[in-house]
Amino acid sequence: MTYIQVKNEGKFYPMGEALIMANKDVTFDIEKGELVIILGSSGAGKSTLLNILGGMDQADEGEVLIDGVDIAKLSSHELTNYRRDDVGFVFQFYNLVANLTAKENVELAAEIVKNALDAEEVLERVGLGDRKNNFPAQLSGGEQQRVAIARAVAKKPKLLLCDEPTGALDYQTGKQVLQILQDMSRKEGATVIIVTHNAALAPIADRVIRMRDARIDSIETNPRPQDISSLEY
């Protein structure tokens, strides 16, 4: 079942008297429950696209259909509801609240939606049950990233958007984070989109979208995604 349809999406930013093209004629479909990787070098337009899919920015051209609704035409209030109810975000930098414990950071996100998952249960799922009462400064980078994932997962998002989620992590911790994201797709049915410049991650995806110079360069589907345990990158 098609969950995301992007049709001729374009995004431009003014710079002086010129317009900078961030996305141009971007078109693709994503099926519900897929794990998708968007690849591209810095400046290719992939983070802009992720922000538009997440309702943090809006397209200037084209359509961005999420579950049949064109979010490019939503009001600011409607976009807020969309982000709250349907979307989870994971970034390279964890954005945890420093004076809240791991559990409290997860609870903070869970409070804004109905039927959220239990914070302790989600922290157990990401291997941090014994660290729930620690503050961010007491956690390693990998542990902080897993708290950030738990915070996103607790909302039970239909769409999980991840911008370079392993970029600041060591190899083993990065694989742990990728396993959690793959499980969200395989076991929870969430549609997971990972933006990265690391092409070595492509084999784990159901679909790989490559961007270059603000446009889609290629789209590939993978009938047999690789297990994280056997991934080398």
Go through each PLM region and give its residues.
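Conserved beta-strand-loop-alpha-helix hinge in the C-terminal portion
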Residues: 207, 215-233
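ABC family nucleotide-binding domain
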Residues: 3-4, 9-211
